[in-house]
Amino acid sequence: MNDPISDMLTRIRNSQMRGKSTVETPASKARARVLDVLADEGYIRGYEAKTGKDGHPAFEISLKYYEGTPVIRELKRVSKPGRRVYMSVGDIPQVRQGLGVSIVSTSKGVMSDANARSQNVGGEVLCTIF
C-alpha cells in the first residue's frame, strides 16, 4: 500500500455509503493524527485501538450519522504520494465557504485549517472534508 491515509479515507467513505456503523483500518501514528482531527471536528464519533483480524494493530472507527444520512458528504485526498501539495497559511483553502474542513500537516502537528490559520502555520494539505 503506497498511501495509507488515502486507504483509510476510502474505507471511511465506502463504509458510510453502505451505512456501516464502524470500520476497521490498520493502525499508524499518521492515521491516528488524522482521526483525532476528524473526531475533534465532529465528523466521526471516535475511534479505538484494538487488534485486527490478522493480529496486527488496528483502529475501529465509529462513524457518525444524522437522521440516517452520513455526516461526511465529501472526503477528498489533496496531497498524494505522486504530487505533494504544500500551502502557506494564506493559501490554505476554505472548504465550501468555511462549512467544511481541510486537514493540514504542519510543523506543529496535524490540525484543521482553522487551527493552522490561528497558529499562523502552513504545511501539507492532506485532505478536505465536507
UniProtKB/Swiss-Prot annotation:
Ribonucleoprotein in keyword set: yes
Keyword RNA-binding attributed: yes
Pfam family, one: Ribosomal_S8
CC terms in the record's Gene Ontology section: ribonucleoprotein complex; ribosome
SUPFAM superfamilies xrefs: Ribosomal protein S8
Assembly mode: Part of the 30S ribosomal subunit. Contacts proteins S5 and S12.
Role summary: One of the primary rRNA binding proteins, it binds directly to 16S rRNA central domain where it helps coordinate assembly of the platform of the 30S subunit.
Protein name, UniProt field: Small ribosomal subunit protein uS8
